[in-house]
Design a protein with these regions (language model features):
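Cell-envelope/ECM-targeting effectors and their regulatory/trafficking segments
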Residues: 2-159
Length: 159
């Protein structure tokens, strides 16, 4: 057997092969773990529907141990907020009055660092989300929304 590089002995070649190949195999395997999408991954398109609501519930369960029911619905939110959120196209229950609020929003407020979290989605909730993602706060979730898309991307890191 002749070697192209005369400075590389058979022993060095075998040693390099024995170390290099398994290491490459481990790297190849681990790179698929990093790039593989989760079965629970959601579309990061900037539009909020029931898929995003369910993803948010899973996210709150994962990062805060919220133990939320994953039903894909942000329940009982005051309807006056809906016109400020055209990027929300589903997965929300808007009610004209007597809203009870949502446990999901309570945990979102906790996650965003509110001292006194509530169950109601308000202008301040949007502003906190926008600030969290480094987006200039305008207290709106237009569609498609950079804020919604940033949230969807973060959800996908955890679910």
């Amino acid at each position: 057997m002749s070697l192209e590089n005369a400075n590389l002995s058979r022993r060095k070649l075998l040693k390099a092969g024995a170390i290099g190949v398994p290491a490459a195999g481990v790297l190849a395997f681990s790179s698929t773990l990093v790039t593989a999408t989760s079965a629970n991954a959601i579309s990061a398109d900037g539009w909020w529907g029931s898929e995003t609501s369910a993803g948010l519930q899973r996210f709150m369960n994962a990062v805060l141990g919220a133990n939320l029911v994953v039903d894909g619905v942000i329940s009982s939110q005051l309807s006056y907020m809906a016109p400020r959120c055209p990027g929300i196209v589903g997965g929300w229950e808007w009610v004209p009055s007597d809203a009870k609020g949502s446990p999901t929003i309570y945990y979102v407020h906790k996650w965003l660092g509110w001292r006194n979290p509530s169950r109601y989605f308000r202008d301040a909730t949007i502003e906190k989300l926008q600030s969290h993602y480094g987006i200039s706060p305008d207290r709106r979730l237009d569609g498609p929304s950079q804020t919604i898309q940033a949230l969807q991307n973060e959800i996908n890191q955890y679910v």
